[in-house]
């Protein structure tokens, strides 16, 4: 698979207070495509960020029910991946930002 297809797999990193605190343990969190498997997520992270992945955990997040002007709808379902890296590797999210 080319690197461009991997960019379709990994949607965006999740940057919150909680994910920042677990990044000290070499764990990084991403929203991924809902059809992605653990092995393809591992290959995508290794190809995009050039790091060595130790483990991948996946969570399926059910969309919440919301009401807007009396109409009940739901938010989209999402898939979250928590990626654990090897000891000497890390990911710099703001590497290209100046």
From Swiss-Prot:
Domain of life: Bacteria
TM annotation in the entry: none
Gene Ontology CC, one term: ribonucleoprotein complex
Similarity comment text for this entry: Belongs to the universal ribosomal protein uL23 family.
Record-annotated disulphide pairs: none
Record Pfam families: Ribosomal_L23
BP GO annotations: translation
Database matches in InterPro entries: Nucleotide-bd_a/b_plait_sf, Ribosomal_uL23-like, Ribosomal_uL23/eL15/eS24_sf
Species of provenance: Rickettsia typhi (strain ATCC VR-144 / Wilmington)
Function per UniProt: One of the early assembly proteins it binds 23S rRNA. One of the proteins that surrounds the polypeptide exit tunnel on the outside of the ribosome. Forms the main docking site for trigger factor binding to the ribosome.
GO molecular function terms noted in the UniProt entry: rRNA binding; structural constituent of ribosome
Keywords for this protein: Ribonucleoprotein, Ribosomal protein, RNA-binding, rRNA-binding
UniProt name for this protein: Large ribosomal subunit protein uL23
Keyword Ribonucleoprotein: yes
Quaternary state and interactors: Part of the 50S ribosomal subunit. Contacts protein L29, and trigger factor when it is bound to the ribosome.
Keyword Ribonucleoprotein: yes
Family annotation (NCBIfam families): PRK05738.2-4
């Amino acid at each position: 698979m080319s690197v461009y297809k991997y960019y379709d797999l990994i949607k965006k990193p999740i940057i919150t207070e909680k994910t920042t605190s677990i990044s000290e343990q070499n764990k990084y969190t991403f929203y991924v495509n809902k059809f992605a498997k653990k092995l393809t997520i591992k290959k995508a992270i290794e190809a995009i960020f050039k790091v060595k992945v130790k483990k991948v955990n996946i969570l399926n997040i059910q969309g919440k029910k919301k009401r807007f002007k009396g109409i009940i709808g739901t938010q989209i379902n999402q898939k979250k991946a928590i990626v654990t890296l090897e000891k000497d590797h890390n990911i710099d999210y703001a590497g290209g930002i100046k």
